[in-house]
Design a protein with these regions (language model features):
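Protein kinase glycine-rich loop
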Residues: 14-21, 25
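Activation segment signature within eukaryotic-like protein kinase domains
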Residues: 139-140
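Glycine-rich ATP phosphate-binding loop
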Residues: 27, 36-62
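Short beta-strand micro-motifs within the conserved protein kinase catalytic domain, predominantly
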Residues: 95-110
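AlphaC helix of the protein kinase catalytic domain
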Residues: 122-132
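Catalytic-loop of the protein kinase fold
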Residues: 151-168
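Conserved short submotifs of the Hanks-type protein kinase catalytic core
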Residues: 107-121
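AlphaC helix of the eukaryotic protein kinase fold
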Residues: 58-86
Length: 169
């Protein structure tokens, strides 16, 4: 896998299911009280996003200014996910279960954990099941419903693409 160490007691990483410009997403598993497995997705966003970003910032600003800028970015990301609370329960929007902000040992960065329901991406679903015309129409209607809900809450998605469209498992 990679060198990511999970800091969520009771949960274990099953696999990395995706990565993008804002972070990585892992499939998690936890035993429920009856011995069954409960699965979730965990998005991990690191601030700064890379050693390169860290080094470039350190070249152009003081450590104090860098820490303040990074903290501001963490607060911005955290605020975006708090906004998703207004959308919780909408049938066409992924539910975010909880969020944690984990400081790095050097106090010059953070990992943001966002635990959410585990869903199947549209490309994975289509390759496994295919889609007929009525499926495509329903998908379009569901997407419009989700985007309308976002608009009503002044939320702009900024990254709509097939890999960010999900289907219930």
């Amino acid at each position: 896998m990679d060198n990511f160490k999970l800091s969520l007691p009771g949960w274990e990483i099953v696999r990395c299911i995706g990565s993008g410009s804002s972070g990585k997403v892992y499939e998690l598993k936890k035993k429920d009280e009856y011995g069954g497995d409960f699965h979730a997705a965990l998005k991990v966003i690191s601030v700064p996003g890379s050693q390169k970003e860290y080094d470039e910032m350190l070249e152009t600003m003081s450590e104090f200014a860098m820490r303040a800028k990074l903290r501001e970015k963490v607060e911005e990301i955290s605020g975006e996910y708090r906004l998703l609370g207004a959308l919780r329960g909408h049938p066409n929007i992924v539910n975010c279960e909880d969020q944690m902000i984990i400081p790095h040992d050097d106090d010059m960065g953070w990992d943001i954990y966002i635990r959410m329901e585990l869903l199947t991406s549209l490309p994975d679903y289509v390759s496994e099941h295919g889609m007929n015309v009525s499926d495509v129409i329903k998908l379009g209607t569901d997407m419009c419903s989700a985007l309308e809900q976002c608009r009503e809450n002044n939320i702009i998605h900024r990254d709509i693409n097939p890999h960010n469209i999900f289907v219930s498992r």
